[in-house]
Amino acid sequence: DAGLAEHLRPGALFVVGTEAILPQQVVHRLGTRLHAAWACLAGVPRYVLATRDKVYPRELLPHFAVPMLPVTELLRQPPAGLQAEARAFDLTPHSLWTEIFVGGAPAALAVQKGDHRLARGLLQLVP
C-alpha cells in the first residue's frame, strides 16, 4: 500500500469505487481513506464512481454500522482474551473527494433527483 504514494504525481488521478454513499461520508474498503488523504496532500484530484444502488437512504441511517471482522481475520490462532479492532471498511468525509459521481452525475444531483432506486428496496427490510 505504501508504494501507491509514489504514483501520486502531477497529472495523476485517484479514482475509487465505493460500498455505500452516506449523507456526509463515503464507505470504502479499509485503507482507502489513507490513500485518499495521501492523494489530497499530493494535490492529486480524487474521484468516487458509484452505481445508483450505492446511495444509502437517509431513513436507514440509524441501522447503518461499519461491520467488524472477527479477530481470526488478523490471526489464525489469537491468544485468549486478545481484543482487536478489525474494521472491514473506512468512512471518508465527502469533503476529501474532488467529486463523487453516481450513475454518471454528481452525487448531489443524483440524490436530489432520487436517482438511487435500487437502494430504496432496502426500506422494505426495516420494520
Task: Annotate each predicted stretch with a short phrase.
Residues 1-127:
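Conserved phosphate- and dinucleotide-binding cores of soluble alpha/beta proteins
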